[in-house]
Design a protein with these regions (language model features):
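Aliphatic-rich helix starts adjacent to a transmembrane/signal segment
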Residues: 36-51
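Extracellular/periplasmic head regions of type IV pilus-like filament subunits
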Residues: 56-127
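Conserved Rossmann-like nucleotide-binding pocket used by diverse enzymes
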Residues: 8, 19, 31, 43, ...
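N-terminal leader/signal peptides at the extreme start of proteins
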Residues: 1-12
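Catalytic phosphate/metal-binding cores of nucleic-acid and nucleotide-processing enzymes, i.e., regions
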Residues: 13, 17, 52, 56
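Conserved catalytic core of two-component sensor histidine kinases
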Residues: 21, 48, 55
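Alpha-helical hydrophobic helix detector
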Residues: 18-34
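Protein kinase-like catalytic domain
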Residues: 31, 39, 59-62
């Protein structure tokens, strides 16, 4: 069967496919860092909200038990459980970025800290 001069095979040329792949690569190079940054920001915000909730629970615990400034730190696992909203598994909220929370003496600033603190951006600390 003879092909005419103007007849063309169906499909994409190599150049067209390379252009599409380059565009997809460029979009991925722009989008992926933004997704990573959004995830880190979301984790930091969740951690800060947990710190606020634990800080409020420490204040409630200290008021109810007449603890004065400088009193020993409250235990996250036993002392604060009645004063804090537990997560779905029935435990104290945890840092979503795998940090650990530590309580300090009553009235200190801050009363609760995350082990990640300023080591990550954005930071996991109470403003």
């Amino acid at each position: 069967m003879k092909q005419t001069k103007n007849a063309r095979k169906a499909g994409f040329t190599l150049v067209e496919i390379m252009i599409v792949v380059a565009i997809i690569g460029l979009l991925a190079a722009i989008a992926i860092p933004n997704f990573v940054k959004a995830r880190a920001t979301s984790q930091a915000n969740a951690c800060i909200n947990n710190l606020r909730q634990i800080d409020a629970a420490i204040n409630q615990w200290a008021l109810e038990l007449h603890q004065t400034t400088g009193a020993g730190p409250a235990s996250l696992s036993s002392d604060l459980t009645p004063y804090i909203k537990l997560n779905a598994s029935g435990s104290i909220p945890q840092c979503p970025a795998s940090g650990t929370y530590t309580t300090a003496t009553v009235g200190s600033t801050p009363q609760v800290t995350c082990s990640l603190g300023n080591t990550v951006t954005p930071g996991h600390f109470l403003p």
